[in-house]
């Protein structure tokens, strides 16, 4: 679950990721969410009709020699080094879940000091959107 501001300050957008192959269960979940008083709208973001991303920050312990290797791995994944300490780096990565997991697999030989992930958020492709009208 992720939540954040929208173009309309009256609303907060929440993204709930469900892995469900049973359409009846998915419809039941949507109906239950729609009953909540503060729910304005529910939109299903199908993988082929949406863009989804997740943000991850990873603090990795590195010595002088390891630093170059971790930076090179980060570059391959289009990560950004957002902090450099004497014995650590913080890497920022944005992408789909498999990209972030791929990065973590490659740096598993290093000591990960801290890890923070936002969870998935997304928008539908094209001009269709959720309008914030009363």
Residues of each region from the PLM?
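A conserved regulatory-domain signal marking ACT and ACT-like small-molecule sensing domains
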Residues: 1-134
């Amino acid at each position: 679950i992720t939540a954040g501001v929208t173009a309309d300050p009256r609303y907060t957008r929440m993204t709930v990721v469900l892995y469900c192959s049973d359409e009846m269960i998915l419809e039941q979940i949507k109906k239950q969410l729609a009953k909540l008083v503060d729910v304005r709208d529910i939109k299903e973001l199908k993988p082929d009709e949406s863009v989804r991303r997740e943000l991850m920050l990873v603090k990795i312990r590195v010595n002088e020699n390891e630093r170059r290797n971790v930076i090179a791995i980060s570059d391959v994944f289009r990560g950004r080094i957002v902090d450099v300490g004497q014995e650590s780096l913080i890497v920022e990565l944005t992408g789909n879940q498999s990209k972030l997991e791929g990065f973590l697999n490659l740096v598993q030989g290093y000591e990960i000091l801290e890890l923070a992930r936002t969870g998935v958020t997304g928008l539908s492709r094209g001009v269709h959107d959720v309008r914030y009208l009363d």
